[in-house]
Amino acid sequence: MRRLLAILGLFGIFLTPIPEAAFGGRAQAGQVGFASWYGKPHQGQKTASGERFSRGQLTAAHRSLPLGTKVKVTNLRTKQHVVVKINDRGPYGGGKGRIIDLSEAAAKRVGILARGTERVQVVVVENAS
């Protein structure tokens, strides 16, 4: 029982999002968690930035990074990566381990379209202007 609790505790640590404040406002070391994606049902809807969502653009939703920030998202299983602009807020569903929602185009680039979710690392590459 102790061993099981220890394993669950370690698993929880790896799924806990790292606040950007821990990196002086910039997630240089990265944030690890799960990415999901959103597409056609949201096409044309306004995002938190005021832009219209386009599933063909390389954009993403994040709960706390400033809108306009560019991040590199790396699929930890396949090592595929993409740079996206944060233009929306989320993810709001799917469980506590989710840290970013990718547009359909971005999800395709990192190879998570078919699986729906994947463990990723998110690293800020350019702060919002």
What are these model-derived regions, one by one?
Residues 2-129:
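Secreted/periplasmic proteins
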